[in-house]
Amino acid sequence: MRVSAIMKTHSVPHDCGFRTILSLATPHHMLCDHVDISQAFVQGDFLPGDGYNGKVYISPPPGFREDQGYVYLLSRPLYGIPSPARAWHTTMSAYLKSKGCAHVGFERSMWCVTIKRHTILIASHIDDFMLACADRAMLDTFRQGLLARFDGTYEGEVHTYLGCEIERDMGAGRTLLSQRHFAEDVLRIFAMWDCTPAIRKRCSMLTWDIFPNIMLGKKSHF
């Protein structure tokens, strides 16, 4: 059975969408919370086209007792079958829609909702949620509702998301994004953290005063 790419994939927020939430949260003094959903795929519901007549059967996993002539009926989507990511996204989206949330533009994993004049911004990267709202009580209520529907943990204020470190100064109205830890990890993995940087020689014949001429289409001699 051929499975389309849309059935296998899970929509995730683009980097620009994530930065947009923070750019809105900063001047509006929004608090940003981080929620992690536990075993997200098994908390999704099967899609109508999954398996045979809506039921998915599997053979016993390696090392497990195998009775001749028997197969197992899955009760929840598992990682490894074609559509668990899409099933989770569909289930999670249905819940958010039931709470009045609407998609933001072309982003399928970003939502917003206004409750009692308080706007909540939501981003979901599979099992990682970032929730932003200027009112702490409203943010807590929404987060608690999410965790009542899906098993997960409250990780506190968001400090890392989509590979970026997030440093916020609420008083100064400033947010700093950094990937320093990622660059450091790569250098340490390849034993290059303590390497001496190579000295790049500057070409004495190439001077900055030629660039205005290049931009204007004038000839320059090297």
Each language-model region and where it sits:
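Long, low-complexity, charge-biased intrinsically disordered regions
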Residues: 1-222
